Amino acid sequence: MAGGSQENTLLHLFAGGCGGTVGAIFTCPLEVIKTRLQSSKLAFRAVYYPQVQLGTISGEGMVRPTTSVSPGLFSVLKSILEKEGPRSLFRGLGPNLVGVAPSRAVYFACYSKSKERFNNIFVPNSNIVHICSAGSAAFITNSLMNPIWMVKTRMQLERKVRGSKPMNALQCARYVYQTEGIRGFYRGLTASYAGISETIICFTIYESLKKHLKEVQLPPSSNGTERNSRNFFELMFAAAVSKGCASCIAYPHEVIRTRLREEGTKYKAFIQTARLVAHEEGYLAFYRGLFAQLIRQIPNTAIVLSTYEFIVYLLEDHAK
């Protein structure tokens, strides 16, 4: 009994790790663009009409412009390609790959294990089970992986002219430790905890859609290949819809987290950052980079979840 449970946990660890790695590689350029859009260093560039004069960046004497032009996804993409070269679109991929496989592996293993436990407490496979399982898994994963995501964000925000050598992950980690100490690796963790709401929303919608789609089955005459193909695309659809809805609802925590992780930042705490961003840039600033996030996260989550489910299906089928 214990051996079967251990094998099941290892299966979810392996499947989650594979899914996360595949998704990270395919969507890395959009991750870099999204992080740049969320950064305050982009916010105060010359994107306003010239007749408006701003005061200091700290906000003293600042006159908020009545009309502003915010740089979009394609503007940032063009700027990165022209000034830094195409390799910069993969900044932070190293720590992302180092972190994403264990991160997804831990997440899916915790989610699966929590689901087993909560099914014994609440009505099996009910919404409350999915909410508690997703929340528990996200809390554990965020606590363990924040140092790696901190280094990744710093690397993505670093701007280097074409031809110059950027910091690698180890150099970046060493620099953070020397300038900020151990606490520096946990900047943005409170925002990540706030982001657990996104995970809960995502998995609740995903499990509900999966349950609904399972009820609409192909007729018995359908062959196995057709059935498996439809199941795979149904899972991708469920993952894409659930992540899209969750991202739109809970996106502001992403902007706050990026601001908290910036180097030499004036942003100190979650609430203080939220107030400062709202005061200096307006409430729309909380949704900067949302388009990049959606076109990155929707396919990424679809790839991760469908790869995870597919590997679980293959390995369980092989074990029979």
PLM region spans:
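Matrix-facing interhelical linker segments
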Residues: 1-320
